[in-house]
UniProtKB/Swiss-Prot annotation:
Family, as annotated: Belongs to the GnRH family.
Main location group: secreted
Compartments it resides in: Secreted
Recorded name of the encoding gene: gnrh3
PANTHER family per the UniProt record, alphabetical: GONADOLIBERIN (PTHR10522), PROGONADOLIBERIN-2 (PTHR10522:SF6)
UniProt-recorded Gene Ontology molecular function terms: gonadotropin hormone-releasing hormone activity; gonadotropin-releasing hormone receptor binding
Residues recorded with modification Glycine amide: 33
Modification Pyrrolidone carboxylic acid occurs at: 24
Organism, as annotated: Pagrus major (Red sea bream)
Protein name: Progonadoliberin-3
Amino acid sequence: MEASSRVTVQVLLLALVVQVTLSQHWSYGWLPGGKRSVGELEATIRMMGTGGVVSLPEEASAQTQERLRPYNVIKDDSSHFDRKKRFPNK
């Protein structure tokens, strides 16, 4: 009886060690050193390149609209830039 319990404990210990050594030691999608895989980076760049616009639902609350509203909007009119004023020596 003592030999079988010892073997059982050893098998459980071996299973635990194997499980810990084969498990992933970093977050899913991240490589060691905090680097992302190239496939996920490519997908992120594609998503940004499409100019994806987040549309608000019809029943969006005022709090949600305030949170999604851009704070600094740059106008297309660039006439307010005057190089002579910014760089007087050129």
